[in-house]
């Protein structure tokens, strides 16, 4: 189904956050992407942007808003939500929040009476239980949204879920969209994927990616690495160079933030007119990204959470699913390297992905079970 690279470094994201960013062994974050740090070096959350209405929203993140991946994607989702909700005011996010500081960071916003506190990854699920329980009694107008979190698996130790919800993107749709593009654009029938850490979301994305590519172009093979971390661009370069030289890979998709930048460097060195990258989770197609032909874009559904708070239906530990129907998942712009007829085919397949008729769960599971 796919071949795992020999260049792997298993690492605990949570443990690596405390070690810094010096080596591959320190590359990790529980939610996805970005480096560790402390609240002391982060934004205090005192400044604000957006509207001046009766609601306030703030985000706590593991990395920085300019990381080009996970954290920036969350920040852009937050900005879009505030722009479409003029009665909400956005406080500046707390960046580079380490696990040890996550609870105190959340508590500071609770003390300010912030109506919606967003944690950008499941690392916050394991550190906020006590803060959430206390806030339910002392500040019932405060609500918590934790992204990339399965409430049935990751909120089991919460004593109160009255003011908590999570967001789960449709990973199968995301992977399928990327796979359709890769399958139609590869000339060598060899594609690659780099993930920061082996999580259920990572393996689901890759399995759908490969299954979709094989459906549109039979015979496609996949190379993968799920343990690359999120900060070492040079590792992304090494992995991609290895796959280009040994496996003739000509299309890459990544889920590893800064590591993806390194993969793009290797693709460009091999020839930007013949070697392509599909970016995620933000749309970065442009002249400064010569290998990027499109992007799989994730919106973290913060606007829906705001609507639920205003409507009085927020809470209960429910998960908001981001998918193609509610624009939680989409494809970004196309580079002019994607021919018009290929773009038309992609649109046709994307409609099938959206309707659920393109891939079956069994087709994806058949690949995922081998990983």
Predicted regions and their residues:
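N-terminal secretory signal peptides
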Residues: 1-11, 15, 19-30
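Short, aromatic- and cysteine-enriched interfacial helices/patches
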Residues: 6-7, 34, 371
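Bacterial lipoprotein signal-peptidase II cleavage site
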Residues: 32-44
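A residue-level marker of the well-folded mature domains of exported/periplasmic proteins
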Residues: 42-371
